């Protein structure tokens, strides 16, 4: 689609070459044939280093757009991006292509296998599972009943996916109009699981908007956990039941998230950190320490002192 057509669809103005745009992408990864966006000062510093062919920006950020990149100026770049994401969304079903199922793999009855699926040696796929188009599953995996693996997702070797878990569903992302309507952002990324990963029953892992939601080797995730879009979990993490990680959370290696704990979006937790049950991570946390509480979260030893002070206060009063 030409920039002139895009501008009409999102009520934007531009001057410069009327480029053909083939996809949407992030500021960091967009190329000359792709369109990106920036909707605030937080990410404005990345505009000058982006390789995007064109960018959606507000008038206030126009001076930051480098030469050679076409600026589409609009009131709400995030909303414009959401509108365009539907146009550039991948199709639900691909053209039929043969799949590659290892002879030693076991496929039980009532399994749906899409186009161009690969299933490795000695992997077992139990009844009722759904394997979307272009899914890759490594060797020696066990895919339990009614597991859903959506298009383009990658499962490593020796993985266990327990019943009813969902890998690669759309993330929870919306832009908002002035009249209160919520406009869906379509997700074109995927989910990548490393080797020896276990995903508990009824856990959901959302696909990335552009790139991959990443679960590294040896990470174990309990039942009823929600992993948001674009999260990155390092090697050997332990995620206990009812934990929720908001989008773009980054966990280092061997991080432990206790039961019913959670994180705000775009936070980083360092290697070997431990978050106690019901802990709420609202800011970046250094590794190698134990944390508890929510507002504010603090080191476990400080949390004990804080609770003791509260008890002493009420005893005095």
UniProtKB/Swiss-Prot annotation:
Q: Which GO terms describe its biological process?
A: lipid A biosynthetic process
Question: Which key words are in the record?
Answer: Acyltransferase, Lipid A biosynthesis, Lipid biosynthesis, Lipid metabolism, Repeat, Transferase
Reactions accelerated catalytically: a UDP-3-O-[(3R)-3-hydroxyacyl]-alpha-D-glucosamine + a (3R)-hydroxyacyl-[ACP] = a UDP-2-N,3-O-bis[(3R)-3-hydroxyacyl]-alpha-D-glucosamine + holo-[ACP] + H(+)
**What top-tier enzyme class does this entry carry?**
transferase
Give the molecular function GO annotations. Answer: N-acyltransferase activity
Q: Which GO terms describe its cellular component?
A: membrane
Q: In which pathway does it act?
A: Bacterial outer membrane biogenesis; LPS lipid A biosynthesis
Assigned EC number:
2.3.1.191
Keyword set includes Protein biosynthesis: no
Active-site residues, Swiss-Prot/TrEMBL:
229
Any single Pfam family the record assigns to this protein: LpxD
**Which superkingdom does the taxonomy of this entry point to?**
Bacteria
Explain the purpose of this protein.
Catalyzes the N-acylation of UDP-3-O-acylglucosamine using 3-hydroxyacyl-ACP as the acyl donor. Is involved in the biosynthesis of lipid A, a phosphorylated glycolipid that anchors the lipopolysaccharide to the outer membrane of the cell.
- Quaternary state and interactors: Homotrimer.
**Which PANTHER family does the UniProt entry name for this protein?**
UDP-3-O-ACYLGLUCOSAMINE N-ACYLTRANSFERASE (PTHR43378), UDP-3-O-ACYLGLUCOSAMINE N-ACYLTRANSFERASE 1, MITOCHONDRIAL-RELATED (PTHR43378:SF2)
The entry's family comment says: Belongs to the transferase hexapeptide repeat family. LpxD subfamily.
Query: What's the protein called, per UniProt?
Result: UDP-3-O-acylglucosamine N-acyltransferase
């Amino acid at each position: 689609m030409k920039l002139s057509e895009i501008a009409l669809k999102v009520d934007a103005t531009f001057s410069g070459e009327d480029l053909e745009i083939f996809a949407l992408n992030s500021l960091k990864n967009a190329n000359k044939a792709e369109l990106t966006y920036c909707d605030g000062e937080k990410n404005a510093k990345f505009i000058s280093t982006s390789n995007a062919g064109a960018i959606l920006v507000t008038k206030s950020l126009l001076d930051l757009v480098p030469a050679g990149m076409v600026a589409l100026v609009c009131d709400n770049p995030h909303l414009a991006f959401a509108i365009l994401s539907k146009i550039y969304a991948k199709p639900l079903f691909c053209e039929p292509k043969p799949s590659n199922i290892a002879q030693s793999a076991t496929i039980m009855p009532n399994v749906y296998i899409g186009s161009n699926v690969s299933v490795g040696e000695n992997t077992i796929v139990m009844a009722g599972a759904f394997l979307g188009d272009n899914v890759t599953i490594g060797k020696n995996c066990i895919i339990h009943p009614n597991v859903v693996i959506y298009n383009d997702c990658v499962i490593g070797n020796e993985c266990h996916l327990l019943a009813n878990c969902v890998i690669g569903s759309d993330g929870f992302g919306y832009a908002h109009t002035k009249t209160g309507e919520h406009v869906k952002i379509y997700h074109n990324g995927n989910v990548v699981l490393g080797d020896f990963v276990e995903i508990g029953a009824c856990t959901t892992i959302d696909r990335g908007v552009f790139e991959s939601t990443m679960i590294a080797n040896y990470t174990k995730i309990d039942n009823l956990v929600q992993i948001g879009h674009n999260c990155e979990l390092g090697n050997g993490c332990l995620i206990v039941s009812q934990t929720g990680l908001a989008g773009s959370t980054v966990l280092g290696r061997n991080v432990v998230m206790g039961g019913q704990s959670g994180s705000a979006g775009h936070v980083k937790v360092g290697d070997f950190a431990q978050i106690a049950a019901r802990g709420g991570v609202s800011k970046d946390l250094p590794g190698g320490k134990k944390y508890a509480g929510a507002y504010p979260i603090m080191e476990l030893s400080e949390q004990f002192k804080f609770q003791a002070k509260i008890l002493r206060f009420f005893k005095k009063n």
